Amino acid sequence: MTFGKGKKPLLIISGLGDGLATVKGMAQMLALAYRGFTTAYQVYVFSRINELPENYTTRDMATDIAEAMDVLGLKRIAVLGISQGGMLAQWFAADFPERVEKLILTVTTAKLNNLGRERITRWLELSQTGAYKELIFDIVSHSYTAKSFGKFKYLYRIMGIFGRIKDKQRIAIQAISCLRHDSLAVLEKSKCPTLIIRAEEDDVLGVGASLELHHHIKDSQLTILLDCGHALYEQHKDFQKRVLVFLES
């Protein structure tokens, strides 16, 4: 999927939510959500491939991104990876360094800590029992700050009533790939300018994940956005501004 009026390419790699719904048919919504990028950039948003094989890893997913770029004729691109998308972006920058102009790793980790493992395992269990309402409620309750969650919790309860899990295997394979993700040994291979963005109140990955990335990626920049949770890319009004400043620097 692509949108935007600019000439410079920007790739956005989405998170684990791709296991529940791909980006197909969501161009207008995504263009609105990421409107801060659409003037200067031609934005590409990739879902995972349609048929996910067993034992499909975050590294495999990164290789698929390189192949998709070949099809589109994209040689070199700025990459914004969010949550699980950041895991893919780490492998992409390590395995295909010549293709990454700049890298933004947002609310992501090189390896899940105990908190992240607890969250993903819980979501995996709920997804496999078909408990869509409980799954959505649990994701949202841990992704937003208590203040933000309080405003929208009834809306998400209603959404949970009418939604359903379309493909249990798809979400399971992606969740398991998160649980197995470990890129610590290759982070030093990433040579491009890198911005790491952390949420002050991240209740999915905690605060240590971004610090670990910053420690292992040489000359990386670390930005902490205050008063927001894991869903900072939706919550924080300065998120896109910070990314643009980095991209244009």
Q: At which residue positions do the language-model features occur?
A:
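Gly/Ala-rich beta-loop-alpha elbow adjacent to hydrolase catalytic centers
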Residues: 81-85, 89
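Flexible "cap/lid" loop of the alpha/beta hydrolase fold
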Residues: 94, 101-130, 170
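Conserved alpha/beta-hydrolase "acid-adjacent" motif
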Residues: 203-209
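Conserved alpha/beta-hydrolase catalytic His-Asp/Glu region
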Residues: 114-117, 134-179, 186
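Conserved acidic catalytic loop of the alpha/beta-hydrolase fold
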Residues: 60-77
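Catalytic histidine-centered segment of alpha/beta-hydrolase-like enzymes
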Residues: 228-240
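Short beta-strand/loop motif that positions the catalytic acidic residue
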Residues: 190, 196-198, 202
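Conserved HGGG/HGGXW glycine-rich cap/lid loop of the alpha/beta-hydrolase fold
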Residues: 1-52
